[in-house]
Regions:
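Walker A/P-loop
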Residues: 219-260, 325
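Peripheral, non-AAA+ core regions of ATP-driven protein-machinery
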Residues: 1-218, 222-228, 331, 471-472, ...
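Walker B catalytic acidic pair
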Residues: 300, 306-307, 318
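Residues immediately C-terminal
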Residues: 110, 303-304, 310-311
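Basic, amphipathic alpha-helical bundle interface domains used for macromolecular binding and assembly
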Residues: 39-44, 59, 66-76, 289-290, ...
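P-loop NTPase nucleotide-binding/switch module
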Residues: 170-209, 213, 240-295
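The Walker A (P-loop) glycine that initiates the GxxxxGKT/S ATP-binding motif of P-loop NTPases
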Residues: 221, 285, 307
Length: 513
């Protein structure tokens, strides 16, 4: 008897329907066709053992499994459960006509237990789009999938529960999640606050500007000046995720398999801080079977690269295209996979190998060549893509001893939210543009044209600092953000002056010996 089970394959961060057809033939083996990978082919023994251990009898026939469409690669062990249920349906253990109402996914243990899978959220979204009655999947993934409304999500621990559900012997209660309540519940819970930071008012201001416009920022300072400490507090002043952003962010982490069991919705912006030994594939994504990298896991959030010159230069260079396009395409011989990568880059570095160039009390022991060589590890095109380049000076004793708390993250965040609200109104009719950092050159002429005094100031700066055309655009974007923080309709000379002050590495005299 032919049975058809509905499953899914994840491509990028979206799912595609896969139909698993099962029937019997002469012999005693399992044959799987339809472009399965090694893990799917190995499911034959897992399926056979799981069915027998669950108290059912595996058919003493050849089981032929066809996974269509045949041109889509089926990867991973998540097809164990639908193959097993399809086999039981062909053997009339469960009614085959019931299978058309459900999507079924899950990895099987040899004892029939159902184990966690990757990509449950995009699969659940697909199941709703197909107007299916429900989605049967591992219990560990149930909360994640249940944020999709108008879909019954059944979390199971064992294959026998699926059989009982399909036979109507023991109905399961679907997992129910109030998506909007979950979204609102965890908003604003941050472990770090800017009120803990002593001094560094200029750096706090730079962070405020960066968050208000979604700009990339580089911190340059000696060890112990507070670069990493302040970077950890950056998420606390970013504007909250919208529900659409939260769903998209959760989808990426679902595909990567990085969601913890019981997680429903990611409600705070991601903060990723990979070590400087990271590989290209781990940073931008890829592999034999492409998975999202750190730049995609930081989508709608922050990617913090500490000690930037210590990263492999080739690893840093692969970020250039995603920083511009805010997405990354992983190409293989027969297909391409697209992952979102709209993140805010926050990087830090020492000014020289010893770390003390420009320190007020500790002398630098590096030669001029060593300083220039250290900085040259970061290419000019990459530096051009970093809007704000800030020098971080050590905090003096008086500031450290001051018991007065600094300005709280919440008060800074409110100013950031107000500036973002202006940008949301500005770009409401421009799909894909949400903040000033994403503006095109044409938009700069429309929204960031400075007054006559600002134009003259900008001309002098460009000529003296020998800036690139990209750096010129970055200054205008930052100036527009500064104007938004002041609720100013126009970009004035004072805004241009502050934006130029955030281009430390563009100054021809940065390393003066």
């Amino acid at each position: 008897m032919l049975s058809k089970t509905i499953a899914a394959a994840v491509q990028g961060i979206d799912a595609t329907m896969v139909t698993i057809e099962t029937t019997f033939d002469w012999g005693t083996q399992i044959v799987i066709v339809g472009l399965p990978d090694t893990a799917v082919k190995e499911s034959t023994e897992r399926v056979k053992c799981a069915i027998n251990e669950a108290g059912f009898t595996f058919p003493n026939k050849t089981v032929v499994v066809n996974m269509s469409p045949a041109d889509i690669k089926k990867e991973g062990a998540a097809y164990d459960l639908p193959i097993a249920i399809g086999t039981l349906a062909s053997d009339e253990v469960v009614p085959a006509d019931r299978l058309s109402k459900y999507m079924i996914m899950g990895e099987l243990g040899l004892d029939g237990s159902v184990r966690k899978i990757k990509g449950a959220l995009p699969m659940a979204i697909l199941a709703r789009e197909l107007h299916l009655e429900g989605f049967i999947l591992p219990k560990e993934n149930a909360s994640e999938a249940a944020i999709v409304n108008n879909l019954k999500v059944y979390g199971v621990d064992h294959i026998s529960q699926v059989v009982q559900l399909l036979n109507g012997e023991q109905p399961l209660e679907p997992t129910v999640i109030d998506t909007r309540a979950e979204f609102a519940k965890a908003q604003g819970n941050f472990p770090f606050d800017f009120s803990d930071v002593k001094g560094q008012d200029n750096v706090k201001r730079a962070f405020e500007v960066a968050c208000a416009g979604g700009h990339n920022i580089l911190l340059i300072g000696s060890p112990g000046s507070g670069k990493s400490m302040m970077a950890k507090r950056l998420p606390s002043i970013l504007p909250p995720l919208s529900l659409a952003e939260a769903l998209e962010t959760t989808k990426i982490h679902s595909v990567a398999g990085s969601l913890k069991s019981g997680t429903t919705l990611l409600t705070t912006r991601p903060y990723r801080a990979p070590h400087h030994t990271i590989s290209q594939v781990a940073l931008v994504g890829g592999g034999t079977y492409p998975t999202p990298g750190e730049i995609s896991l930081a989508h709608n959030g922050v990617l913090f690269l500490d000690e930037l010159p210590e990263f492999n230069r080739n690893v840093l260079e692969v970020m250039r295209q995603p920083l511009e396009d805010r997405q990354i395409t992983i190409s293989r011989a027969k297909y391409s996979t697209l992952y979102p990568a709209s993140f805010m880059l926050v990087a830090s570095m020492n000014p020289c190998p010893c770390g003390y160039y420009g320190h007020p009390s500790k002398p630098c022991v590096c030669s001029p060549y060593q300083r220039q060589h250290y900085l040259s590890k970061i290419s000019g095109p990459l530096l051009d893509r970093i809007d704000l380049q800030i020098e971080v000076q050590p905090v003096n004793f008086e500031e450290l001893a001051d018991k007065t708390p600094g300005e709280s993250s919440e008060s800074i965040r409110q100013r950031v939210i107000q500036a973002r609200a202006l940008q949301n109104m500005r770009f409401q009719n421009t799909p894909g543009i949400h903040c000033n950092a994403q503006m095109t050159t044409a938009m700069l002429h429309q929204w960031a044209e400075p007054d006559s005094e600002g134009v003259e100031l900008l001309r002098n700066a460009i000529e003296r600092m020998n800036m690139s055309a990209r750096a010129y655009d970055r200054i205008l974007k930052v100036a527009r953000t500064i104007a938004d923080l002041e609720a100013s309709v126009s970009v004035r000379a004072s805004h241009i002056m502050e934006a130029i002050g955030y281009r430390s590495l563009d100054r021809g005299n940065y390393f003066t010996f």
